[in-house]
Structure formats: C-alpha cells, structure tokens
From Swiss-Prot:
It comes from Chlamydia trachomatis serovar D (strain ATCC VR-885 / DSM 19411 / UW-3/Cx). Belongs to the NAD-dependent DNA ligase family. LigA subfamily. DNA ligase that catalyzes the formation of phosphodiester linkages between 5'-phosphoryl and 3'-hydroxyl groups in double-stranded DNA using NAD as a coenzyme and as the energy source for the reaction. It is essential for DNA replication and repair of damaged DNA. NAD(+) binds at D33, Y34, S35, Y36, D37, S82, I83, E112, R135, E171, K285, K309. This is DNA ligase. Zn(2+) binds at C403, C406, C419, C424.
C-alpha cells in the first residue's frame, strides 16, 4: 500500500459504506466478496497506522446490515456475528495455527457448506415457532417472523424430545429451481429479474406482504443451535437439529485433522456444480463447544470459525459482439454479448467489460472464446481468453469516437469515455430509469420497462417529465389499462414529497452516491443551500473530498440542471427539509401503517414520517403513538382499537405531514 492521505481514507470509508448498503439493505451488491474483503483489510490497515483519522461511521465499526426501517428491531439472545473469510490453503493453515496456539493443542473440526443466502436467528418457545430475526448489526436484528414463517422446510412445532425453548441459526436461500421459477415470473410481469439467488432471498425477506413471500419458495438450512441442553460438539448439535425436523444442508462432517479438512474441501469443490443451491465455500468450526467458548470472539468475528471461499465458478463461451451503452452520467460502457451459458445457477448472456483500457489490457476481441465467471456470484465478467481458439482474422476492438446514441463526439477522460451532450437520449433514458428506481425516488409501477416504453413514445424525455404525465396521455400508450394508469399516477403523486437526500441521489450528480447525498442533506438541510454551496463549504463536510465537491459545484452551475429542478418544483415536487432532533415535531413517536394508502405508497409515507423524527413499526403495542389505517385495514386496526390507541386516516396523516415537513 503506497502513501495514503486522509482524503483517500474518507473516500475508502464512503465507498465501503455504499457497498454495505447495496449488499445488506438493497440486496444489490456490485463487487465480489473478495474485492470487498481486500478493501476492508486496506481500511483496517490505514486505521491501525492512523488511528487519529478514524471516523465514527467507519464500516469497520459494524457488520453492515443496517435496518431497512420496515420492521421492528429486536436484540439478539447472543451476538450474531459474521465469519472471517480466507481464500487460500495457506490462509487456512494460519487459522489452524492461531487456533491451536490459543488452545495449546489441536482440536477436532467440523465442516459444513457455506450456502450463499441470508443469515437468520429463529426462536422457539414451548417447542412452537415464535420469532425470526435478521442478523442486523450482530447485536440487534429486524423482526422478519411473518416472512420466515412461509418457509415450508421450517418446522412450526418441534417434537417432545427437543428442549422447550431454543434458538437455531441458519441461512435462508432459494434453490436454483426456485430461483429460475421466480425470474420467469418476474419476466412475465415485466419486472426486473434478480441477479442471483442470494439477492432474491434477501429481497423476499424484506417484502411487506408475507403472501407474496410465500409464493417465492424460500428454504432454510440450519447451521447452529443455542439451548441449555446442547451437546458437547457442534456436529452433534446439527444431528439433533436434523432429528427435530430442520434441514441441514450438505452432509456436515467431523474432521480429526487439518488434512481431513483439506480433503473434504476438495471433495465439496468437485461436487459443487451438482448441488441444488448456490454455495460460495465451506465453513470450518472448532467442533468442541467448550473450546469454542474458550476461544470467544472479536468485535466482528468468531475466533473458532473460518469460511474457506472457493474461486468463482467459470465457464467458456463465445464473445459474439461488443455493444456500447450510455450511462446516466454520460459514461460509455462496453458490454460483451455472449453465446448463452449456464453459470452459478443462472443463464449468462452478457458481461461487463468496464472500459477501453480493460479491453486493451486483456486484448479481448469479438469472436474470441472467453472464460466467464461471476465475481463473488454477482456480475458476470470475462477473466481470460482461450487464445488457441482465436481466429487469425480477429482485430483489436476500439471504443467509438462518436456516441452510439446521439452520434456526437465523445470526450476521453483519465479512464472513462463520456458523451457530454446534455440532450443525448441514451444517457437521459438511463438517468430517468435511475431517478424512478428503488435506489432513488422509489416510484412504484415505474420500472425500467415502463420508463423505456414512455420514453420511446415521446411522453418523457427528462426526469421532470414524469411529474407532467397525465391520464389522457397514458391512455394513448398501447398496453396501458385504466387500473395501471391510476396506480402509476398515484405513485407519481406520492413521490412529489421527497426527502432531500433522496432527491440529491436521484439527480445523478457525478461521484455523489447515497452516502454523499445524506452527508449533504445533514449539513445543509435545504435544497437551496446545497445548490448555492461554495467549493470550500462543500469540502468542509466529512466524506466530501475535492473531486466530489468540484463535481457538485459544476453540476449546479449548469443552466439545464437548475432549470430541470425548477420545472420539477413547478410541477408540484416539494423537497422535505432535514430537521434536527429539536425541531422534529414527530421526534420519538412510533407509528404503524396498515391497509392500503391511496395518495402515496407505504414506503413514501414511512420516509416522510422519519423526516419529521418519527419511527415506523410493523407491530402494534402500547408504545404506538398512532395507527394509520388505509383501506382494507386488518388485525392491526382491531388491536389498536382494543388498546385505545389513536387511529388516523390517510387524510389526517397528510395534514400533519404537509403542515410540518416542506421546506
């Protein structure tokens, strides 16, 4: 690692916080586990060398799974930590040596599959299923009981030989078969497909409707048991779980020696492709429970366990073409069109090529037979070329000098090639899709396919056009029915009240992600102050370096960007100010939403309540301040009435929100 400045440190923190959010909250990771671990180790090394730089929000301080806000948060019975990863047999030997040095002798080990899913804790009371929690930050997790209860392989009642009260920990996942069924359903409904089974499982556990979750065929494999009556060994505990009706995947095995462990690792790697679910490695644990207790844990990991990660699965196929896409900030990205191949449980027909430099470095050519892998089972990429199969007539590929969409000249930057035409329809389509997406304004019923259709027929050509859509215009679009039109217009109306950080993210300011947008909103409070901010003022904000600050100033200095914001405001968009705890009128008050809202989505309502300091829970209790009852409200409304709680309709909620929240 070369010389590092504090700005470099802050930039790395910010990058990892964003990766944590994408992995744990959005279930949309963009880098491999290995790349993440390398960056995390670099961050830890910097903090050791420069402890005075360490910020309170450093990703080394938590596990990354921040609450989504949709479910109540509950403490774990004991820390639910992650397991450290190793990627080579040499690193595994270091784990063995470290463990044996701490104990003073060589313990036995158990070995099990590392399923690529979502970790959960499941509690039983009087042998009946009682509660399920996500891992969360390791100390507290979200109550996902309703969605976990839809897992058919999860026993609702345990046999008499099981202890009355116990907790199991396991991995929620989707089999390859269930994953393919789900994506087929997504395609039929015109929705985006999930990138991989883990993303699909994570998204399912976050659903607000357990009826929808039940349709997705989640599965659960148990990997741990917490009870006063547990056996002396971890392996025996897993056998007990299996006897009580839990699914324990992949033949856990006791290993007497290091060599036994290595042999088993190789056996599983050979059978990996034939397994019915995605795995990304194996977990090795000290088998004796008393030894586990002696070894203890760190702030992030168990000392008695390690995950050995396999190299990503690889396949060979033909590179049929290279197409160039224009992104939301105008960057041109080459994409490989591949002869379809099955890899890591899904059909792969495209792969990212990143940029011209990457293509030149690997000398990738159209017609090549290439090796493709999913980095950390996330995004397919080309990792090599079978030169023995290369045609003598193949030629090096070059990035076009004109934008493939608007045909204007492109500009070569340090690494990227960018179309700087503000009217380029290619970049604008991507920008509008992102603006409406879950990561930005989260406008229901306005997914990528709908945006593309509206763009192609000329109804929208900018983000602000979304708010000008009218019923009579939409009726002219083939395939749009009355109900879908009403749903879309209702979602757009709800999106007109938008939190400041959400809007800043949605504007696609170069180098400003969600973390930067939150920092700007926290510091300035209003949109006008952000727009008028100077370079020096921006650079005074922790996490905003010179490059990002210059990009923000440049963005808001452009007439077309200011005009776009002005038009949004003319069309009714109101930016919710970021209020301090002292000013927040709903500070500390807990709300529960039930039934269907008509004028905004539930997510939009929750966000507006939080902007005013309120909290949103999924369950009614004596601490609930008010229950917001929409149409078809069910059991939560009845419970609120029984407890004598305040019950508001949607109009009452909107009256409070509109009076208090608009800057």
């Amino acid at each position: 690692m070369g010389a590092v400045s504090r700005d470099d440190y802050i930039a790395l923190c910010t990058e990892l916080v964003e990766h944590d959010r994408r992995y744990y909250v959005l279930n949309q990771p963009t880098i491999s586990d290995y790349s993440y671990d390398v960056k995390m180790r670099e961050l830890q090394e910097i903090e050791v060398q420069h402890p005075e730089w360490k910020v309170s929000w450093s990703p080394t301080m938590y596990l990354g799974d921040r609450p989504s806000g949709q479910f109540p948060v509950v403490p774990h019975s004991s820390p639910m930590l992650s397991i450290a990863n190793v990627y080579s047999l040499q690193e595994l030997e270091e784990f063995f040596s470290r463990t044996e040095k701490l104990l003073g002798y060589s313990p036995g080990y158990s070995l099990e599959l590392k399923i690529d899913g979502i970790a959960v804790a499941i509690r039983y009371e009087k042998r009946l299923f009682a509660q399920a929690l996500s891992r969360g930050n390791g100390v507290k997790g979200e109550d996902i009981t309703a969605n976990v209860s839809t897992i058919r392989s999860l026993p609702m009642r345990l046999p008499q030989e099981a202890p009355e009260d116990l907790e199991v920990r396991g991995e929620v996942f989707l089999s390859y078969e269930a994953f393919e069924e789900l994506n087929a359903c997504q395609r039929e409904q015109g929705k985006l497909e999930f990138a991989n089974p883990r993303n699909a499982a994570g998204g399912t556990l976050k659903l607000l409707s357990s009826k929808e979750a039940a349709k997705r065929k989640l599965d659960l494999s148990v990997y741990g048991l917490i009870t006063d009556q547990k056996k002396r060994s971890h392996f025996e505990n897993l056998q007990l779980c299996s006897q009580w009706g839990f699914f324990v995947a992949g033949m856990p095995k006791q290993c007497r020696s290091r060599q036994d462990v290595v042999e088993r690792i190789r056996e599983i790697e050979e059978m990996r492709a034939a397994l019915p679910m995605a795995i990304d490695g194996v977990v090795i644990k000290v088998d004796n429970i008393a030894y586990q207790d002696r070894l203890g844990l760190t702030s992030k990991h168990y000392r008695w366990a390690i995950a050995y990660k396999y190299a990503p699965e690889r396949a060979e196929t033909i590179l049929e073409d290279i197409v160039v896409q224009v992104g939301k900030t105008g960057i041109l990205t080459p994409v490989a069109e591949l002869a379809p191949v099955f890899l890591s449980g899904s059909r792969v027909s495209r792969a990212s090529l990143y940029n011209q430099d990457e293509i030149e470095k690997k000398d990738i050519r159209i017609g090549d037979s290439v090796y493709v892998e999913k980095g950390g089972e996330v995004i397919p990429k080309i990792v090599g070329i079978n030169l023995a199969k290369r045609s003598l007539e193949s030629e090096p590929w070059k990035m076009p000098s004109l934008c493939p969409v608007c045909h204007e000249p492109v500009v070569k930057e340090k690494v990227s090639v960018r179309c700087v035409n503000p009217l380029c329809s290619g970049g604008m389509l991507e920008k509008i899709c992102f603006f409406a997406s879950k990561s930005a304004l989260n406008i229901d019923h306005l997914g990528e396919k709908v945006v593309t259709k509206l763009f192609e027929v000329g109804l929208i050509s900018s983000c602000s056009d979304i708010f000008a859509l009218a019923e009579e215009d939409l009726k002219q679009v083939p395939g749009f029915k009355d109900r879908s039109i009403q749903n879309l217009l209702a979602s757009i109306a709800g999106a007109k009240k938008v939190a400041l950080d959400r809007l800043l993210t949605a504007l696609s300011i170069p180098f400003v992600g969600s973390s930067g947008a939150i920092a700007l909103a926290d510091h300035f409070g209003t949109l006008d102050k952000v727009i008028e901010a100077s370079l020096d003022e921006l650079m005074s904000i922790e996490g905003i370096g010179p490059k990002v600050a210059a990009s923000i100033v440049a963005f808001f200095s452009k007439h077309e960007n200011r005009e776009e914001i002005r038009r949004m405001q003319e069309l009714g968009v109101q930016v919710l100010s970021k209020q301090s705890d002292k000013e927040a009128p709903l500070q500390g008050k807990v709300f529960v939403l039930t039934g269907t809202l008509q004028q905004m989505t539930r997510t939009q309502a929750e966000e507006r309540i939080r902007c005013l300091g309120g909290k949103v829970s999924s369950s009614v209790s004596k601490s609930t301040y008010a229950v917001i009852a929409g149409s078809e409200a069910g059991g939560k409304l009845k419970k609120a009435q029984d407890l004598g709680l305040s019950i508001w309709n949607e109009s009452e909620l909107l009256r409070i929100l509109d009076a208090k929240s608009v800057s």
